[in-house]
């Protein structure tokens, strides 16, 4: 498994995450900086295929067995929005889904979230 920091426009800090998922599977994640109340962002994933919440830490991401043996663990300071490459989760879904998909992970201070989607997320400062 590899990862790439793609949320460069999101200034690094400690963000609390809030999620809004519609009945049509449209996912928006709102980030609010716990120290600097002026830093607020929305990551709009559009219609997603799958999402799951990760509670406090990579060791609880059970579908990514190779995380524990890999040389490099992404930390909160490595990026808030990451594109995950060659993951077990993405590979399992891709076997049954004909279109190309992307695996993203958003890391917050209260939890993290895995997202599978066909689209690139849109980041808005609010």
Model-derived features with residue positions:
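Surface-exposed, interaction-prone regions used to assemble/regulate multi-protein complexes
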Residues: 1-126
